[in-house]
């Protein structure tokens, strides 16, 4: 094999390796956009959760201090739960902010968010089409 053909193979391998994290970030047609994994959102402000969703049904967002999933594959919603609305092809959810010390957006730490689509038509036995869990920090 010539050096020129080896460089083509190497470039192709790099492109494929770079594409795989994006593929892994989508589950059941739900792709989280922001906050991104391991991002830090400012304490005392409400972030906007954004996701791209393929398929019909309502889209909901859960925020939890734990990444543990229940039997349906979704995390708890103890910190926040809300219905996302579609704006320009992207679903968005901005939690209501409460200005007291114990509120989660005023409590620095690690949190997890997950979007899921509710679609029960067509004989689907599991109505919750959950997306990937994303770890982020409030700080």
Question: What label would you give each PLM region?
Answer:
Residues 73-90:
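Solvent-exposed serine/threonine-rich low-complexity stretches and specific carbohydrate-binding patches
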Residues 9-18:
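Bacterial N-terminal signal peptides
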Residues 23-48, 139:
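Short, compositionally biased P/S/T/A/G/V-rich stretches that sit at domain boundaries
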Residues 47-55:
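Aromatic/hydrophobic beta-strand junction motif of beta-rich domains
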Residues 121-131:
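Beta-sandwich strand segments
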Residues 89-108:
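Signal that preferentially marks extracellular ectodomain short beta-strand elements
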Residues 60-64:
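Beta-strand signatures of extracellular beta-sandwich domains
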